[in-house]
């Protein structure tokens, strides 16, 4: 079982009409699944776990079932697998980045936290620190550098944007920001940030006294000074609400980003960097 729920009576749709496709073993996906389950009023939501031995067969059978009227794909692998089978029903993507190379769905709940929301959180967390560094992968970024710069300036920040197109250039990109910015925003990017690159990046940030702002709880635990990321449970609930609209024959509306974000601080790293974050200024999870 991926998750177990006590369902709250909120949406009228029959959950058996909704197929949820995901992978077990990913904490963020489990939270999103919990949010999806909380949105339906009765048990019976069908889930295909791609990690199970019968995952591929279960998915094929579920997509062929006449009961299935909408699909929620949780994560990029789930979306790829559903799209590869040419699902004949609407597909809602959750927990998927919406960059230039993102797989397509009929409706999206983007994983991307807007730059305005990130900078707003940093303004509350670290007042007066307005020099914002941004590491951007041109191949994956949803917005061009000039659009990000304009947005940051509108929010009252002085941005320095460095493009980085491959992991081998990540430390060089960080070094280019030394002495120019107060903190560095790292956008979600599985190519740049992974189990091989995170540790040397964190060490370089400590040596260069460049606080990293990560995009997940795991990144903060690994050594980012702070993290700003979606409320994964609420993102799942957003996806369920869109699926329910589709079942009623309504349009899913424009693609949407996270309604709620979460902020975390690595207290030990912040102390090492001399970052006097004001954790009382907004709800913050503190990792010690």
Residue positions per predicted region:
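Short hydrophobic alpha-helices and adjacent helix-cap/hinge residues
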Residues: 6-288
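Bacterial N-terminal signal peptides that target proteins for export
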Residues: 1-3
């Amino acid at each position: 079982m991926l998750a177990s729920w006590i369902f709250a009576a909120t949406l009228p749709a029959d959950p058996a009409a909704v197929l949820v496709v995901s992978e077990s073993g990913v904490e963020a996906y489990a939270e999103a699944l919990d949010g999806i389950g909380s949105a339906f009023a009765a048990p019976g939501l069908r889930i295909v776990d791609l990690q199970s031995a019968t995952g591929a067969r279960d998915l094929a059978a579920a997509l062929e079932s006449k009961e299935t009227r909408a699909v929620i794909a949780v994560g990029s692998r789930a979306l790829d697998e559903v799209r590869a089978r040419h699902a004949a029903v609407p597909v809602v993507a959750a927990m998927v980045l919406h960059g230039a190379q993102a797989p397509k769905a009929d409706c999206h709940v983007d994983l991307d936290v807007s730059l305005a929301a990130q900078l707003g959180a940093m303004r509350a967390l670290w007042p007066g620190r307005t020099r914002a560094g941004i590491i951007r992968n041109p191949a994956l970024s949803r917005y061009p550098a000039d659009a990000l710069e304009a947005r940051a300036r509108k929010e009252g920040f002085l941005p320095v944007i460095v493009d980085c197109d491959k992991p081998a250039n990540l430390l060089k990109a960080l070094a280019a920001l030394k002495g120019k910015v107060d903190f560095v925003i790292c956008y979600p990017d599985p190519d740049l940030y992974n189990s091989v690159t995170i540790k040397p990046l964190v060490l370089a940030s400590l040596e260069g006294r460049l606080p990293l702002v990560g995009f997940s709880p795991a990144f903060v635990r690994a050594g980012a000074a702070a993290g700003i990321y979606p409320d994964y449970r609420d993102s799942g609930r957003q996806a369920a609400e869109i699926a329910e609209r589709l079942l009623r024959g309504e349009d899913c509306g424009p693609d949407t980003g996270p309604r709620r974000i979460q902020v975390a601080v690595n207290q030990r790293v912040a102390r090492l960097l001399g970052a006097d974050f004001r954790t009382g200024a907004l709800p913050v999870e503190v990792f010690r």
